[in-house]
Amino acid sequence: MLRAASSLFRFRVAGMVALSCVFGYLLAAGAAGPDMVTSAAGTFLLTCACSVFNQIQEKDLDARMPRTRNRPVASGRLPTTAARAVGMAALLPALILLHAAGGVRLVLLSAAVLALYNGVYTPMKKYTAFSLLAGAVPGALPPVFGWLAAGGNLYSPEIALLFIVYYLWQVPHFWLRAERDRQSYLAAGLPLPSVELPHRYHALLRLWYASYMVALLLLPVFPFIAETAVRIAVCLAGITGLAASGYLLASPVRGFHAVNVSMLFVMLLLVVDRLVTSGIIT
């Protein structure tokens, strides 16, 4: 039962998305608060709901991929009607929690996430690998959820840069994962960037990866970071990532882990810096 629920809701992904919300909250507030838990819980449930609706939309596609064929909807263990009810059961409390944490703005952003992820990205994914350009927008919004729940300004340059970092990170993350799982994607008939653009794929991948690393290097320029040691560490992460790009991107598995570790490392550095600045860590 728990395994089926985990597969349906994709708890691991939802947990990482909720942590991104916590990250945005801590950057804005500098300390934990009740709205941090409320917004993270709402973001977690919203991600679960999107996952359920996605699996309803892609049940035939999931059934053709070894990685996803045993999901409850794709395998037929959970009827579509029941899955839709489960998705709504996750969505409604998500909207209530997010409204409590950040008001109407978070509810509207939640609607944007659903519209872009389930309404645009999921249908487009069958036809073009560049659907990710739309799908990366909702993927970059969780830190914004936390930022707004903490009372941060939606139009501040800091959260705009953070959104850009998350957006740029997702393209190499998902393209490298697709290349890692190449045979499964081809078996399901999903378009791959390396197949759609065989002569330009590697150049585009390097461009997106380099753009992400440059965005990391811009973080110390903005008032995100107070501690000199943290500024240096973030700069070193970006410079190292750029210098080692040829080696890292030569292997989809190696590149996939590199972009993920770099994002996690920088997130942790920024949180530690903010907690030190707030006096919570001395």
Curated annotation (Swiss-Prot):
Q: What is its EC number?
A: 2.5.1.141
The record's catalysed reaction(s) read: heme b + (2E,6E)-farnesyl diphosphate + H2O = Fe(II)-heme o + diphosphate
So, what pathway does this thing act in? Answer: Porphyrin-containing compound metabolism; heme O biosynthesis; heme O from protoheme: step 1/1
The disulfides recorded in the entry are none
Question: Which InterPro entries does this entry report, sorted A to Z?
Answer: Protohaem_IX_farnesylTrfase, UbiA_prenyltransferase, UbiA_prenylTrfase_CS, UbiA_sf
Q: Which GO terms describe its molecular function?
A: protoheme IX farnesyltransferase activity
One GO cellular component this record assigns the protein to is: plasma membrane
Could you tell me which CDD domains the record lists for this protein?
PT_UbiA_Cox10
Q: Which GO terms describe its biological process?
A: heme O biosynthetic process
Transmembrane stretches, by residue range?
A: 13-33, 36-56, 74-96, 101-120, 129-149, 156-176, 207-227, 232-252, 261-281
Q: Which Pfam families match?
A: UbiA
Q: Where in the cell is it found?
A: Cell inner membrane
Q: What else is known?
A: Carbon 2 of the heme B porphyrin ring is defined according to the Fischer nomenclature.
Task of the protein: Converts heme B (protoheme IX) to heme O by substitution of the vinyl group on carbon 2 of heme B porphyrin ring with a hydroxyethyl farnesyl side group.
Check the record and name the HAMAP family matching this protein.
CyoE_CtaB
Q: Which family does it belong to?
A: Belongs to the UbiA prenyltransferase family. Protoheme IX farnesyltransferase subfamily.
The name under which this protein is listed is Protoheme IX farnesyltransferase
